[in-house]
Amino acid sequence: MLQADGRISNLKLAEEVHLSPTAVLDRVKRLHREGYILGYEARLNPGKLGAGLLVFVEILLDRTVHDVMDSFKAAVQVRAEILECHLVAGGFDYLLKVRVADMVAYREFLGTVMWSLPGVRETRTYAVMEEVKNTTALPI
């Protein structure tokens, strides 16, 4: 229930799960303490904020050695446009999830940012035409 509505009141949550408000509060606190709940955040409309284009970018590094990978990971951390970065197994090294205003903005981002990231040898871009499913809820 908290995944679907992180702002649900303790009283409403207690009613939904048929427990006392005190028991629910204790359980939620325990979930925080034990690291099951990492935090709460607002879901924003990217289009309204000038970030309507979602792209996924495959990154192939010139060398997969620790110093190159560490430099790449550090550089990715400071770019707000890069929402996610995953080291993957397969035909490339990293998969990035990037949000920008539009294709013109992405072209600029690709030329000025992506190619200046440490160790980047090759990129492949996949522009999202339609978000069919977008959730952060885990299947529990």
Predicted regions located by residue number:
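A compositional/biophysical signature of low hydrophobicity enriched in polar/charged and small residues
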Residues: M1-I140
